[in-house]
Design a protein with these regions (language model features):
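Short, flexible loop/turn elements at secondary-structure junctions
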Residues: 78-80, 152-154, 215-217, 252, ...
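Short, solvent-exposed polar/charged micro-motifs at secondary-structure junctions
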Residues: 156-162, 223, 252-255
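Structured ligand/cofactor/substrate-binding pocket environments in proteins
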Residues: 84-89, 96, 111, 120-125, ...
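Non-catalytic terminal extensions that flank enzyme cores
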Residues: 1-78, 225-280, 285-292, 296, ...
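N-terminal Rossmann-like or analogous alpha/beta NTP/dinucleotide-binding catalytic cores
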Residues: 2-73, 80-200, 354
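A short, terminal or domain-edge coil/loop segment
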Residues: 126-134, 158-172, 196-212, 262, ...
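Short helix-capping/linker segments at secondary-structure and domain boundaries
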Residues: 103, 197-208, 313-322
Length: 370
């Protein structure tokens, strides 16, 4: 668990992350701003253009590989604890973006972490995993240009974790992750193995590798980069890079969507009418009355409905700018905006659910499960 001098800044990949000012992360945690690199990125993603990806760690080697059409990898995954939600959607889209830019894509089913962090039995996580991979394929992941695997069944990852354990003291693990049971420290070492496996000779490594993460997962990257430096002589590792994205607010206005509050989030498998109800009841940056909003405008910066557009469901950058300016000017009322958002989200979810049905068998085949 990483904390800064400001008690309101906490990055905890296994717990609660608290961020009041993203700009402070540049100084306090050494995350580098992404914006200065934006004009150099061939075909930047929606998240890059909109500053949703606000930071990075050592992205330049990946950027150079993209510009020079050289080999590089993208690595991410999912903890199989349930259905695809907006956080996993964001990361999956980032993986698919880099895959389309030429990366070899590695996607991990983090079943060891699911067991250690969430007490999900391996048999149960296997069932979740098949559904998660069907979602990934429906979103556009190309399995011919990727490698999908389960942590518990990938011996190379486990071997790396054992080797990395020689360089990880209990004091280091406590400093990075806080006081945890040993199993979570093991899961962190395995995740380091996930991140660095694409650089093994079995996969034509070493090579630049980018890991798209939410800011709450940044401690994993710092830990893994330290291990990569320590084992560079043995494996010739290139220090792994990352892109760092912001965390979406809960629909209820909370700092983060949480399964503890069903009204704060939705999955890609919920009924459209349920999703519509949740958006209709969402917190907004609007004023108490129509008159006040017309006169002084809304506050899109704190509005989860605006974030649905900004992060996920409005592809047109010009429309995003218009929604923002109309809200600030009092031209767009919250009720009208919610109806637009409901239409965009429900249309996307309906189409996704239909596409996903076509990939269930393929997902089971890739994972070798029934």
């Amino acid at each position: 668990m990483s904390t800064a001098n400001d008690k309101r800044t906490v990055l905890d990949p296994f717990g609660t992350t608290v961020i009041e000012d993203y700009d402070k992360l540049y100084v306090e945690f050494g995350i580098q701003p992404f914006k200065p690199l934006l004009n150099q990125v061939p075909n930047p993603s929606m998240y890059m253009r909109r500053n949703v990806i606000f930071g990075h760690r050592d992205f330049e080697p990946v950027l150079n590989a993209m510009k020079n059409h050289e080999e590089f990898a993208v690595m991410s995954g999912i903890k199989p604890t349930g259905e695809f939600h907006l956080g996993t959607l964001m990361t999956a889209r980032e993986v698919i973006y880099f895959q389309k830019q030429g990366a070899k894509a590695f996607y991990c089913i983090a079943d060891v972490e699911a067991y250690e962090d969430n007490k999900i039995p391996f048999e149960k996580s296997e069932k979740y995993a098949a559904g998660n991979i069907a979602d990934l394929l429906a979103l556009g992941f190309d399995p011919k240009e990727g490698y999908i695997y389960q942590q518990s069944k990938e011996q190379r990852v486990k071997d790396l974790a054992i080797i990395f354990g020689r360089a990880a003291t209990l004091a280091t693990m406590k400093a990075v992750y806080g006081e945890r049971h040993i199993g979570l420290y093991l899961a962190a070492l395995i995740q380091a193995g996930d991140i660095l496996m694409p650089q093994l000779k079995d996969f034509d490594g070493p090579k630049p590798t980018v890991v798209p993460v939410g800011v709450d997962q940044d401690p994993h990257l710092r830990f893994t980069r330290d291990l990569a430096a320590r084992f560079r002589r043995k494996y010739d590792f290139v220090l792994p890079s990352s892109t760092v994205h912001k965390i979406m607010k809960g629909l209820d206005g909370s700092p983060k969507m949480s399964k503890r509050n069903q009204m704060s989030y939705f999955t890609l498998h919920e009924k459209p009418e349920t999703i519509a109800k949740k958006i209709s009841n969402a917190f907004t940056g609007g004023k108490p009355t129509v008159r006040e909003q017309r006169e002084s405008g809304g506050i899109p910066e704190i509005c989860p409905v605006y974030e649905l557009d900004m992060y996920q469901f409005e592809e047109d950058d010009k429309e995003i700018i218009k929604v923002y300016s109309d809200c600030k000017a009092g031209k767009l009322l919250c009720g009208e905006h919610k109806q637009r958002a409901i239409e965009n989200v429900v249309n996307f979810v309906k189409e996704h659910q239909q596409r996903r049905k076509k990939y269930v068998d393929k997902a089971k085949e890739l994972l070798q499960v029934e």
